[in-house]
Regions:
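Structural microenvironment flanking redox-active thiols in thiol-disulfide oxidoreductases
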Residues: 80-119, 128-134
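Generic structural signal for well-ordered beta-strand positions
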Residues: 56-57, 154
Length: 175
């Protein structure tokens, strides 16, 4: 192999390492204020109204299966892209996982309905409050928490995630 070719390969590899380092640093920075995932921290309880004005209660100590809680804002363009990934996962999970989508930072129920009109969703859509935002330490949209069957925070993420990335976090795909 020529010396120039080796230099280009090394340079490309170094650029990939720099990109990965920056990506990891940004991801850490985005998630640093979210609730920690650990072997003992239970997810917060909530009682929120759904889009048909029914109250939905979530108590992690009563969990019997894994749950994904997806927090979105109706004005968030990334949320428009990622919520369809979540719905696709829900459709294929055969009811083995609970799914909740929680609207935050909304001004009116109509604003949330306008967002939902662009998506064919079957998961419960809940109207979150400032208390919900604070309890789950949501600092950006979309944000996700995976909660295990014991109510323990297992995984978290903020920003766009691919469908395969979320399937891995939910344990639906093994690497």
């Amino acid at each position: 192999m020529k010396k120039e070719t080796k230099k280009k390969i090394v340079s490309g590899f170094n650029q990939i390492l720099i990109f990965l380092g920056i990506f990891i640093a940004i991801t850490w920075w985005q998630q640093k204020d979210m609730l920690p995932t650990s072997s003992s921290l239970r997810a917060p309880n909530f009682s929120l109204v759904d889009m048909t004005d029914n109250v939905v209660h979530f108590n992690p100590s009563e969990q019997t299966q894994k749950t994904l809680v997806y927090f979105f804002a109706p004005w968030c363009s990334v949320c428009h892209i990622s919520i369809d990934n979540i719905e696709s996962i829900k459709q294929s999970s055969d009811g083995k996982i609970n799914f909740y989508a929680v609207a935050l930072d909304w001004k009116s129920k109509q604003e949330v309905e306008t967002f939902l009109a662009e998506h064919d969703l079957t998961m419960p859509i809940l109207l979150g409050t400032n208390e919900t935002l604070n309890d789950f330490k949501i600092g950006g949209f979309p944000s996700y928490y995976v909660i295990d069957s014991n109510g323990i925070l297992q995984s978290k993420d903020m920003g766009y995630t691919t469908e395969i990335g979320m399937r891995v976090r939910l344990g639906l795909v093994e690497l």
